[in-house]
Amino acid sequence: MKISPTLTEVKEIAKTGKYDILPVSCEILSDFITPIEAMRILQNVSTHCYLLESAQANEAWGRYTFLGYDPKLEINCIDGHMKLGKLSVETENPSEYIRQILSEYKSPKFDYLPSFTGGLVGYFSYDYLGYKEKSIRGKARDTEDFKDVDLMLFDKVIAFDNLCQKIILIANMSLDAPETGYNKAIVELKQLRELLMHGEKKQNMGGKLLGEVTPLFEKEQYCDMVEKAKHHIKEGDIFQIVLSNRLSAPFEGSLFDTYRVLRTINPSPYMFYFSGTDVEVAGASPETLVKLENGVLHTFPLAGTRPRGATAEEDKKLEEGLLKDEKELAEHNMLVDLGRNDLGKVSKFGSVKVEKLHSIERYSHVMHIGSTVRGEIREEYDALDAIEAVLPAGTLSGAPKIRACQLIGELEDNKRGIYGGAIGYIDFTGNMDTCIAIRIAYKKNGKVFVRSGAGIVADSDPEKEFQECINKAKASLKALEVSQEVEE
């Protein structure tokens, strides 16, 4: 088993005093196991696990799939009540505590390793904005007690390299005592290898709907919300607002088989499954919230949608029609401007650029108008600042963002929780990759939830917007239904 880096190299890095930890790694062939099988093994030894994978817009599978289990620490906060493992504190600024924890895990980046080598995995809720924007906080009831932020710190990573058909095992070591830490990391790598090769797989990871799926807002209630929103638009209060509806049903068991189905019927750039202390999430999101890599920020606004054509010719005609739709283009341009404004809050002056405008992004069932906005993060800011600057995305709130969020709180009168928030990771190296929490199913308190929204403008038809919410929820609902018939 070849270990990288060598002990000599580790000692040299430790002498610099720049870092607290370092990723030690080895490689094994992956032809004996799949990521799904690996997750079954991890679930058998820990209730706290995650799986992150990707399918690209060109229908190719993403290069890396990341898995982890048994976190070193769980961090969450709800209404200012924060838990850091066993420690409880009251705070108006959870990000400062998260930042303090990350500051104890500074790590070098090695080019031979994948983008994620350990760090925080989980979600920041849509409502996390309330800690920074006090006018939004407390405007909505929370009947399910969803955390405002829920993150787990993983110092061991299993990375499937789908291109090279190998698994990269990573164990982060402390640089306080390099030789002791190095030897401990090697033991952990051997344990990881043994677990994957001989671990027992957990059975019965399916779930069961125990009753009818019911909406938070019936049709009449939702249409009334739309009319109220249109009044605010006509008064010049806002330009656009995204109003959501939540479907729920009694549920028992796991969402893992739901995830297995979702990744086949709706392959997406961001596919994820994780289970924590009191919540389980399965999702396939098409849209990046914000990404930070080596000091460069990206956000990729998606707005404007058409179904995929049955033939290449029909697909091309649908693309041409979408790019000529003035209403779709106007909405998209507004979101591009919002993305530029959001990145500008934490980027170096003059660095924010629209790299790509009005490209067509094709996915399994739909195509979207996509653009790319880039910025270079200022030295005084970090991944947490970038998330706070962008969250929630304009596609989940509206414009102007703050006023739209205030009205969402008043009209929906129900905290959104995970939906519309950020799901992903913050790496020990300072890099970060998060998606918008849409196309998800999540479970808590014996119930499963699916939430979706529609963008409301001045001439919106309330009944059509209600139906759009239902249509957007179909992939997650179908996955829930089909997963009940999945065989082990």
Where are these regions (language model features)?
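Extended alpha-helical targeting/anchoring segments
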Residues: M1-E488
